Amino acid sequence: MKEKVQTLQDFGEVLHEVRRDMCYATDLLASDLKASKSLFGGVWTGKSHNIEHYIRVFRHLYSEAHNDAQRQKLDDALYALFHPG
């Protein structure tokens, strides 16, 4: 993981992976998925965002994570982002 996350875009990709895993793990209603997409906005479309946007997404995913493995993946990504190399 540590070598994977070197930029904000890398961090966004990990957030997307965890979000996708969370969606597959539950039966999300279409309205829930739509609301989720509007919260995350351009993270999934490749638009650039500042660090505050990514942290807001991280916090939301962390609070909604279904298990320790998802939380650990988020923890590892955040650590790697701020401790490169």
Regions found by a protein language model. Give the residues of each.
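Short alpha-helical "recognition helix" segments of helix-turn-helix
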Residues: 28-30
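DNA major-groove recognition helix of helix-turn-helix/homeodomain DNA-binding modules
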Residues: 51-72
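Short, charged recognition helix plus adjacent turn
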Residues: 2-5, 42, 67-85
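Recognition helix of helix-turn-helix/homeodomain-like DNA-binding domains
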Residues: 33-49
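Alpha-helical structural elements of signaling/regulatory helical domains
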Residues: 21-24, 49, 66
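Helix-turn-helix DNA-binding elements, focusing on the entry/boundary residues of the two helices
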Residues: 15, 26, 54
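A short, Lys/Arg-rich alpha-helix, primarily the initiator
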Residues: 1-22
